[in-house]
């Protein structure tokens, strides 16, 4: 113990010799050992107090700014509601536009279908194919197919189509009550077109037809248009000495003259004389087309009345089907067509060109065989089948015009 005391005294003496600064540092460290804990606690207390103050102030600020936030939130909600409302309005408007467009499209489509039926499309196709075939007959070589020829052909075709629509439209105007029985699907009989609309269409296409004919300057074309107008009007108009469709012979004569004679001769002359500037000269194909189409047009004129017997009888139309009965008229029509095909086969066999001979003989033979096969199974009492067979005869009519240019 004495040794320990002596060592401590020696250490104190050494520190004293080193200087008072070291002694004060050691003594200061000894003094701060207890007071440091109190300082930390005091500092922690001050921090807690400051935090509490900040919390109170933040709470006060939050309370002060809460109305603004509520207002801002309310504004945001109102804006969202407004956007939703605008979106709904836009959707409704878009839906209205779509519905309006669909309604307009449906209405336009309905009117176009009605106009298509008003034009009697099977007659339109017959006019197009017939005039096209006849217009090819004067052509001698590929050099004849020029822009001038195309222009002359289109003028004749457009004028003839407009006159065709006038004739069939006029017939519908005077046959509304009859068509309600015989052809209830036609637009005037079905009420899809008003009488005023029918009159407007008929007059418009008549004016267009004559305008095109006058502009072309073709005498044969104008002759064809004038005769078609006169015969078509006499066939349908209810007036003294008119309404020729009441009489079987006059009705058949109108159709035969226009379809068989006028179309072949007038449009052939238009292309050869007016367009090609050549002297008018008949050809073998032209003579054959005229004679064959006389038979075919007579069949069309007679057969078209077979499904219309009921309405024609009720309104006093004395067609051959009303007088003789549908069965007899049907047998007569089939006999005429088969005889015409037989004659066409003989004419084709007399051709000096092998290719033309093969086409005309085989073509007419095939058409005759098809006709005979279908005619065997037809029930005349079935109006729907008779109407379908009538459309089949028109298809044979179209096919014949494809064979006529090969008859040479």
From Swiss-Prot:
Transmembrane portions of the chain: 122-142, 149-169, 194-214, 217-237, 248-268, 286-306, 329-349, 352-372, 386-406
Membrane protein topology class: Multi-pass membrane protein
PANTHER family, sorted: HOMOGENTISATE GERANYLGERANYLTRANSFERASE, CHLOROPLASTIC, HOMOGENTISATE SOLANESYLTRANSFERASE, CHLOROPLASTIC
CDD domains attached to this UniProt entry: PT_UbiA_HPT1
EC annotation from Swiss-Prot or TrEMBL: 2.5.1.116
Record InterPro entries: AtHST-like, UbiA_prenyltransferase, UbiA_sf
GO molecular function, one term: homogentisate geranylgeranyltransferase activity
Remaining remarks: Seeds of most monocots are enriched in tocotrienols and contain only small amounts of tocopherols.
Protein's recorded name: Homogentisate geranylgeranyltransferase
Similarity comment: Belongs to the UbiA prenyltransferase family.
Summary of the function given for this chain in its UniProt record: Involved in the synthesis of tocotrienol (vitamin E). Catalyzes the condensation of homogentisate and geranylgeranyl diphosphate to form 2-methyl-6-geranylgeranylbenzoquinol. Possesses low activity with phytyl diphosphate as substrate.
């Amino acid at each position: 113990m004495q040794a320990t005391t002596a060592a401590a005294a020696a250490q104190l003496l050494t520190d004293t010799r080193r200087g008072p600064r070291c002694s004060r540092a050691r003594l200061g460290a000894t003094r701060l050992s207890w007071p440091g804990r109190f300082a930390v606690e005091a500092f922690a207390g001050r921090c807690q107090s400051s935090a509490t103050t900040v919390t109170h102030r933040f709470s006060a600020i939050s309370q002060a700014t809460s109305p603004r936030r509520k207002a801002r939130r309310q504004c945001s909600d109102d804006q969202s509601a407004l956007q939703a409302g605008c979106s709904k309005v836009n959707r409704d408007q878009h839906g209205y536009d779509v519905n309006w467009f669909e309604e307009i499209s449906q209405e336009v489509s309905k009117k176009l279908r009605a106009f298509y039926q008003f034009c009697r499309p099977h007659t339109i196709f017959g006019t197009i194919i017939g005039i096209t075939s006849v217009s090819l007959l004067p052509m001698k070589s590929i050099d004849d197919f020029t822009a001038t020829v195309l222009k002359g052909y289109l003028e004749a075709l457009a004028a003839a189509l407009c006159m065709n629509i006038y004739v069939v439209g006029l017939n519908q105007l005077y046959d509304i009550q009859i068509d309600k029985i015989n052809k209830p699907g036609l637009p005037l009989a079905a009420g899809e077109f008003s009488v005023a609309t029918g009159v407007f269409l008929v007059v418009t296409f008549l004016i267009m037809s004559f305008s095109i004919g006058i502009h072309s300057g073709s005498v044969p074309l104008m002759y064809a248009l004038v005769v078609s107008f006169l015969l078509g009007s006499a066939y349908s108009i209810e007036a003294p000495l008119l309404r020729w469709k009441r009489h079987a012979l006059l009705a058949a004569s109108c159709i035969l003259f226009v379809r068989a004679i006028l179309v072949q001769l007038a449009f052939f002359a238009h292309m050869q004389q007016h367009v090609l500037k050549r002297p008018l000269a008949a050809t073998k194909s032209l003579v054959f087309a005229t004679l064959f189409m006389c038979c075919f047009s007579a069949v069309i004129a007679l057969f078209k009345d077979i499904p219309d017997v009921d309405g024609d009888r009720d309104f006093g139309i004395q067609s051959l089907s009303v007088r003789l009965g549908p069965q007899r008229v049907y047998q007569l029509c089939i006999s005429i067509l088969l005889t015409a095909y037989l004659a066409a086969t003989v004419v084709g066999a007399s051709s000096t060109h092998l290719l033309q001979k093969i086409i005309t003989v085989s073509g007419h033979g095939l058409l005759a065989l098809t006709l005979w096969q279908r005619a065997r199974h037809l029930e005349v009492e079935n109006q729907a089948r008779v109407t379908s067979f009538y459309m089949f005869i028109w298809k044979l009519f179209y096919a014949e015009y494809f064979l006529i240019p090969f008859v040479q």
